[in-house]
Regions:
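Phosphodiester-processing cores and adjacent nucleic acid-binding clamps
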Residues: 1-287
């Protein structure tokens, strides 16, 4: 299950069309996937519609087999085959997981002083209807009250609207990884305890490994991930926190990396041949 996925609704960063993500996911034999766009839930309606469209086709096939199962004239062999096929089709029902990669202010959404206050990254997933309502509330507050470069929330809002939510510590831009990279291991552990205290077993440490041999790709991210992952794994063991491995999906197919590279040039306002411009690892496809 992919739990860290960006669509084109991650504006000028993600490149994946929502139906293409679902198509690739199901064709690859994966029947659950989250959508976690940067700071917004703009794609959730399209995500739910695409999932329902796919599931509708599967359910139609199940109904056809149920007709055979209930056919008084069908022999036992056909009914047995139909029962097996129904069980098989049920495993192909897609579970869309509604989420968001939020920006979480390090102190408060009221504090707006410099780059640091733009916010850490944080993966938030709704595990039930109440979680969906709380996720919508957080997203709305982030835009209405917390906007500073990015739509932001903070710890107090997470505590207030925590019910029904699952939290993952996110990429290198997350609170724990940022503190680890700054040498503040104690601070990272304190943050971990805060999340565990609020979310309990619904808080997960997230690790990523974007090793790359692609030309013109970021070669440093993997090294930083390896260093951070060692500390995260140690903290997970020390605090009995569950770990999830994710890929920071920004495009659907491997060959889309070059087009995505150009998109990043647009979003950062840099020329393609600028040696100092931002690069991704080109590993950010739906694997």
């Amino acid at each position: 299950t992919h739990l860290h996925v960006h669509s084109h609704f991650s504006i000028l960063d993600g490149m994946s069309k929502v139906p293409d993500l679902i198509d690739k996911c199901t064709r690859s034999g994966m029947y659950s996937m989250a959508l976690t766009d940067h700071g917004n839930m703009f794609g959730i309606k399209e995500f739910a519609d695409a999932a329902n469209k796919y599931n509708g086709k599967i359910k139609d096939k199940i109904k056809e087999q149920e007709k055979v199962l209930n056919d008084k004239e069908a022999d036992d062999a056909k009914k047995d085959d139909a029962a097996v096929e129904i069980d098989h089709l049920k495993t192909k029902i897609l579970k869309p997981i509604i989420g968001m990669e939020a920006y979480c202010a390090p102190v408060s959404i009221d504090k707006r002083d410099g780059r640091a206050d733009r916010g850490y990254h944080l993966i938030i997933l709704a595990k039930n209807k109440q979680g969906y309502k709380n996720l919508c509330k957080l997203s709305s507050i982030a835009y209405i009250d917390g906007y500073y470069y990015n739509p932001r929330i903070d710890h107090s809002l997470l505590e207030k609207y925590h019910e029904g939510l699952i939290i993952c510590s996110a990429c290198l831009g997350g609170e724990l990884p940022q503190k680890i990279m700054n040498g503040d291991i104690e601070g990272a552990e304190q943050s971990l305890h805060w999340f565990k205290n609020i979310f309990g077993d619904d808080f997960y440490i997230e690790i990523q490994r974007h090793k790359t041999d692609k030309p013109n790709a970021d070669q440093e991210t993997f090294e930083r991930q390896q260093e951070v992952n060692k500390v995260l794994i140690d903290l997970a063991r020390k605090t009995n926190t569950k770990i999830v491995a994710t890929n920071d999906v920004h495009f659907v197919e491997e060959e889309h990396s070059e087009a995505h590279d150009r998109l990043i040039c647009l979003s950062t306002g840099k020329d393609f041949d600028d040696p100092n411009r931002m690069h991704y690892t080109k590993q950010e496809w739906l694997k």
